[in-house]
Every structure is written in structure tokens, then in C-alpha cells.
Swiss-Prot record:
Record field: catalytic activity: GTP + H2O = GDP + phosphate + H(+)
HAMAP family linked to this entry: LepA
GO cellular component, one term: plasma membrane
EC number(s) from the headed UniProt entry: 3.6.5.n1
Gene: lepA
Gene Ontology biological process: positive regulation of translation
Taxonomic source organism: Pseudoalteromonas translucida (strain TAC 125)
Lineage of producing organism: Bacteria, Pseudomonadati, Pseudomonadota, Gammaproteobacteria, Alteromonadales
Entry protein name: Elongation factor 4
Principal place of residence: membrane
Membrane topology according to the record: Peripheral membrane protein
MF terms in GO: GTP binding; GTPase activity; guanosine tetraphosphate binding; ribosome binding; translation elongation factor activity
Entry-linked PROSITE patterns: G_TR_1, G_TR_2
Length: 596
């Protein structure tokens, strides 16, 4: 056991985590040069296209250190984006140490900070690594000072490396062996294995990634899932090197996979404990706190007969992505679908893309909303995540919106424009401190403003230099209203949004104008209205198409022309009474773009 080292790699987006993982795999000979490819651990197509890590991946490598001993390194490459912090905290629970990778050109960023504090709270040994020293703008000394100043860990002897060129990788490996403590555990105690991650394989059933805390697990053992007492036989046990390799045994302190032919999707949930059927452990290991979704949206299959396969796809995805929440929903405009909860807008985009690619389902997604607390005269306080669930205006005493604490790190020259942006988004500044050339500002912002497009705007106002990390703080009373969209005097429930009263009129106007462009013209006028309760705040009209009915009249009396025009007018009137307006798919997407 003293030769095992479990560690994670944590960093801000684009600081080179996945490339560093590639180098570690290459140096330790995990894959041959022919099998090696860029970002070998980013196995999903979406990860490669976007250049981001979404799922944490684990790898076991054997490394011969300078002291002549062979060490088993189990490491987990984690995502860097703020939407996937849950993946990071889960990975850290399986480790004793963490490599904190910082770009030597850009320095410390907000997500570096957040992930590092998570690691320190879990009592992990944090090893700073300065990456990208081959870049012309790299300034390792300044960045080392920044790490000490902002995070407060000793970084003067931090390893300097370039994951791209391979410089300094050997030093990184030696630091891991020297500084990361070996795991502790009792190999003779009853088996306790923590499930860190799981996914569904169509041929093998549920594949679980586990960390053995006590005891050992062999292929052929009868194992019990402690949350539901189901008993299975461990068919295959092994590690990822990064290829799936059967070893037949996992010992105390190791990280590997177990396949037990579990066919029901939630048969071995993440955070659960596996033990032996006969010599069972008395207690479960403390799992992970259930994460609450921050953003909700309705998802509906375009073809109504795909509903069951859509449910199936969501079930399989939720096994692999424990932070996805969903429940059935029915909309008058869109039929049957699901109300889904996500950690943020990027998470929502990724899930939608994975459903369309991996499961081949075409979806319509409604406008995302956050959770609001509503206090009513009749039913007291309750939470809603869907604008159409909001009770009648005269029954509401107050609406409370969620407020987040946003920590922003920004270079001094862009501070002014970032403060302006935060004020526009109804933010309240609570803290500001200077660290060298960087400024750390803390704002309390409404979550609804942050999840929509705040991240994109922050990046564009600071030319990409500002970084953001946020977490939920509390609910606060606010003047929120529901803006309904009426098409031909009929309410379309899927187009409703909740907005602040100050911005409701402009949001309503933008929505009406966007719909005017997208809904095709009919044979009669279509009125598009935005309304709060019974009060219309914006209106626009799509003009009818009309045939020139008097083209065939040559001369003759004017009453002949009037008669034809009146006949046409009456026809249009009848048509309007019975005519239905189809709202195209693009109209629902337009809401997502409004306000950007």
C-alpha cells in the first residue's frame, strides 16, 4: 500500500490539465506511441470538439521512481468549468493529493481558487505545478508569487513544466511520489468500496468506478450494494490504463472498475458503498452531498412517439451524470416531455447535444429558468422552477429570487468595465482586494442574470482575462413578474418567462420582435402580445398575405371593386376565427437568445 499514490489534476479551463495527463500516460508507458492521441482521456466527441473536459476520467499507471521502487499512480483528470464542480469534488474524495495546474502566462484564475479550496477542505496535499513555461508570455516567478498571495500555499519550489513539449514532466512525477501521502486503510477489514462514478454499457450493464477504502475485491466475489441490499457477482474487476484492463483483484487504496452485470440503471448509484455479501461492513461510507440543480428547462421530443426512448435516454444519462435531474411535464403547446434540472447553461447545452448525438433524439428546449420561492396567501411558501406554475398575481404576497455570491478575478485595466457589467445585472459589491496586477471582486448577483449570459459578457468586456466562480447564497425578495406571450390572443405556455419588473417591458418587446421574424405570415393578421397578468406591455403584428382580388376588373363601376374587397375581408375574418398559428422550433430557440 505504501507504493500507491492517488491524486487528481485540478485547474481552471484551458490551463493544460488534459495535455499534462497525456504526458504522464506517455512517460509511464500507459499507451504505445501509436495509440497515443491528443487529449486521450477526453473520450467524448463533444469534449474533443469544444476542447473541454466534461467527465472526470481515471487512469492507473506504474512508474519507476528515482529511488528504484515501482509506484502505482492512480490519477483522475477533472473538468475545469464552473458547471462541473460536482465532478471535481467527487474525484477529490477518492484521492490523497491534488496537482494544482496553473498557466504560467495567465496566472491564478477564479476556478483555480475554488477547486483548490475544495481540495484543502478535504485535507488533500496540494502540489502547485506551473504549466506552459514554453510560451513567450510565461512569467513563472510572478505566477508563483500570485499563488502564494491569493491562495496562500507555498509555491516558490513549484515544479515548472511544459506539458506540450514534455519539459519537467519527470520532476512532476517525482514530486507526486515524494509529497502525496499513501492511502490508509485496513486490508483485513470487511470490504468497503466507494462508487465514484458509473456509466451504462449496452453489453455489460452498469460499470462502476470504485475506490477501495478497506479490504479487497476479487473477480467472482458476491458483492452487496449497501443502499438497496441487492446482491450481485463481480464478473470483471480491473483498472484503466487508460484501456480497460482486467486484473482480477483490487486491493486497499486502489482505484479501479467493477462490472457485476447490473442491468437496472440505478442499481449502483454514485456515492454508494459496495461490500461483500457474507462478511459485510457494518456501516456505509459517507457519500457525496446531493447536488441541487441551478437551472431548469423543459425538454420535449419533436416526434411525440419518441417519448419513451427519450425517457430511456435520460435514465442512462443520469446514471453517468449524477447532477442531472428530470421529471415528466405536460405542455399544451408542446405535448409530453420532461422538466430537466442542470448545473448551468453549459451543462444544459452539453446534455442536449449528448441526447441528440448519442441517442439520436431531436428536441425542443424551452427558456431556462432558476428556482424561485413564492409566498402566497393560501398555500404559504413553496418553490417553483416553471413560469407556468406561478399562481395568480392577486394571490402572491412576495416572490424571492436566488442570489449567488460571485467571485471575479480581473486584471486592473478591465476592472471598470466589469463593475459596469455587474451593476447592469443588478449586482451588489461586497468585497474588493488587490493582488499584484489582479483584482479580486465579490458581488452578490441574481442567479437568473448569471446563468443566462453573464459568463459570455464577462469574457467579452475583459477580452477573456476575467474569470468567474459562483455559489448559491440565499433567497431575496424581489419584484419579479411573469411575462406571458399571446399569439392571436392565445397564451403559449412554453414561451412564458419570469423577469424583473424593470426589465420586463424590454424583454417582452424583444421577444415579440424575435417571434415576428420567425413565425411565417398567414392569410390573416397575427397579433403577438407580451402581457403581465391582463396588462399588455408590448405588441407587434405580422401582416397578412393578400391576393389582389380587383386585378381582373377593367374599368366598370367602383361598387364592383368594393364588393370584391368586402368579400375578401369577410373571408379573412372567418379564417381568423378558425385559423391556428403554428409556432416553429426556431421561435423557442429565439427566447434563449433574447437579451444577449
Amino acid at each position: 500500500m505504501k507504493h500507491i499514490r492517488n491524486f487528481s489534476i485540478i485547474a481552471h479551463i484551458d490551463h493544460g490539465k488534459s495535455t499534462l495527463s497525456d504526458r504522464l500516460i506517455q512517460v509511464c508507458g500507459g499507451l504505445t506511441d501509436r495509440e497515443m492521441q491528443k487529449q486521450v482521456l477526453d473520450s467524448m466527441d463533444i469534449e474533443r470538439e469544444r476542447g473541454i473536459t466534461i467527465k472526470a476520467q481515471s487512469v492507473t499507471l506504474n512508474y519507476k521512481a528515482n529511488d528504484g521502487e515501482i509506484y502505482q499512480l492512480n490519477f483522475i483528470d477533472t473538468p475545469g468549468h464552473v458547471d462541473f464542480t460536482y465532478e471535481v469534488s467527487r474525484s477529490l474524495a477518492a484521492c490523497e493529493g491534488a496537482l494544482l495546474v496553473v498557466d504560467a502566462g495567465q496566472g491564478v484564475e477564479a476556478q483555480t481558487l475554488a477547486n483548490c479550496y475544495t481540495a484543502i477542505e478535504m485535507n488533500l496535499e496540494v502540489i502547485p505545478v506551473l504549466n506552459k513555461i514554453d510560451l513567450p508570455q510565461a512569467d513563472p516567478l510572478r505566477v508563483a508569487e500570485e499563488i502564494e498571495d491569493i491562495i496562500g500555499i507555498d509555491a516558490l519550489d513549484a515544479v515548472q513544466c511544459s506539458a506540450k513539449t514534455g519539459v519537467g514532466i519527470a520532476e512532476v512525477l517525482e514530486m507526486i511520489v515524494k509529497d502525496v501521502p499513501p492511502p490508509v486503510g485496513d486490508k483485513d477489514a470487511p470490504l468497503q468500496a466507494l462508487i465514484i462514478d458509473s456509466w451504462f454499457d449496452p453489453y455489460q450493464g452498469v460499470v462502476s468506478l470504485v475506490r477501495i477504502k478497506h479490504g479487497e475485491l476479487r473477480a467472482g466475489d458476491k458483492i452487496k450494494i449497501m443502499s438497496n441490499d441487492h446482491v450481485h457477482t463481480a464478473d470483471q474487476v480491473g483498472v484503466f490504463t487508460p484501456k480497460q484492463t482486467n486484473t482480477g483483484i483490487l486491493r486497499t487504496g486502489e482505484v479501479g472498475f467493477v462490472i457485476a452485470g447490473i442491468k437496472e440503471i440505478h442499481g449502483a448509484p454514485v456515492g454508494d458503498t459496495i461490500t461483500h455479501q457474507k462478511n459485510a461492513a457494518p456501516l456505509r461510507l459517507p457519500g457525496f452531498q446531493k447536488i441541487k440543480p441551478q437551472v431548469y428547462a423543459g425538454m420535449f421530443p419533436i416526434a411525440s412517439d419518441e417519448y419513451e426512448s427519450f425517457r430511456d435516454a435520460l435514465n442512462k444519462l443520469s446514471l453517468n451524470d449524477a447532477s442531472l435531474f428530470f421529471e415528466p411535464e405536460n405542455s399544451t403547446a408542446l405535448g409530453f416531455g420532461f422538466r430537466c434540472g442542470f448545473l448551468g447553461m453549459l451543462h444544459m447545452e452539453i446534455i442536449q447535444e449528448r441526447l441528440e448525438r448519442e441517442y439520436d433524439i431531436d428536441l425542443i428546449t424551452t427558456a431556462p429558468t432558476v428556482i424561485y420561492e413564492v409566498v402566497t396567501k393560501k398555500d404559504g411558501t413553496f418553490q417553483i422552477d416553471n413560469p407556468s406554475d406561478l399562481p395568480a398575481v392577486n394571490d402572491i404576497l412576495e416572490i424571492r429570487e436566488p442570489i449567488v455570491e460571485a467571485n471575479i478575478l480581473v486584471p486592473q485595466e478591465y476592472l471598470g468595465s466589469v463593475i459596469t457589467l455587474c451593476v447592469d445585472k443588478r449586482g451588489m459589491q461586497t468585497k474588493m482586494s488587490y493582488h499584484g496586477k489582479q483584482v479580486a471582486v465579490t458581488y452578490e448577483l441574481p442567479m437568473a442574470e448569471v446563468v443566462m449570459d453573464f459568463f459570455d459578457k464577462l469574457k467579452s468586456t475583459s477580452r477573456g482575462f476575467a474569470s468567474l466562480d459562483y455559489n448559491f447564497k440565499h433567497f431575496q425578495t424581489s419584484d419579479m413578474v411573469r411575462v406571458d406571450i399571446l399569439i392571436n390572443s392565445e397564451r403559449v405556455d412554453a414561451l412564458a418567462i419570469i423577469a424583473h419588473r424593470d426589465s420586463a417591458q424590454s424583454r417582452g418587446r424583444q421577444l415579440a420582435d424575435a417571434l415576428k421574424e420567425l413565425i411565417p405570415r398567414q392569410m390573416f393578421d397575427i397579433a403577438i402580445q407580451a402581457a403581465i397578468g391582463g396588462h399588455v406591455i408590448a405588441r407587434t403584428t405580422i401582416k397578412q398575405m393578400r391576393k389582389n382580388v380587383i386585378a381582373k376588373c377593367y374599368g366598370g363601376d367602383v361598387s364592383r371593386k368594393k364588393k370584391l374587397l368586402k368579400k375578401q375581408k369577410d373571408g379573412k375574418k372567418r379564417m381568423k376565427q378558425v385559423g391556428n398559428v403554428e409556432v416553429p422550433q426556431e421561435a423557442f430557440l429565439a427566447i434563449l437568445k433574447v437579451g444577449k
